[in-house]
């Protein structure tokens, strides 16, 4: 499984839903959704500043990430979703050992 960082902002309707049901209920709903897709929630935080919610998820593959983005983004409760693949230091160690035949443009 791969780790992903998700950040998003709630729309006005999304904020109303969080205020009505509570933060714990939102976390539980996300954990249930991710579990049903074969993943786990490592971290779930509400944030102040650039993002309203920040999650670290373990997910099976990029197809699952796309499905989550389509479903959650299409529901109208969140906006400005950003997804990043997270790499461990050991994964970077392995990447550094991988030979890459790259030539810059014009060389």
Give a label for each model feature.
Residues 1-107:
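A compositional/biophysical signature of low hydrophobicity enriched in polar/charged and small residues
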């Amino acid at each position: 499984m791969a780790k992903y960082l998700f950040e998003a902002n709630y729309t006005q309707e999304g904020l109303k839903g969080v205020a009505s049901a509570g933060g714990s209920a939102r976390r539980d709903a996300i954990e249930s959704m991710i579990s049903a897709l074969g993943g786990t929630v490592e971290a779930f935080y509400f944030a102040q500043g650039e993002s309203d919610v920040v999650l670290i998820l373990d997910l099976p593959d990029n197809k699952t990430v796309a499905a989550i983005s389509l479903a959650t983004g299409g529901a109208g409760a969140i906006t400005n979703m950003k997804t990043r693949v997270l790499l461990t230091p050991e994964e970077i160690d392995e990447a550094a050992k991988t030979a890459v035949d790259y030539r810059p443009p014009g060389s």
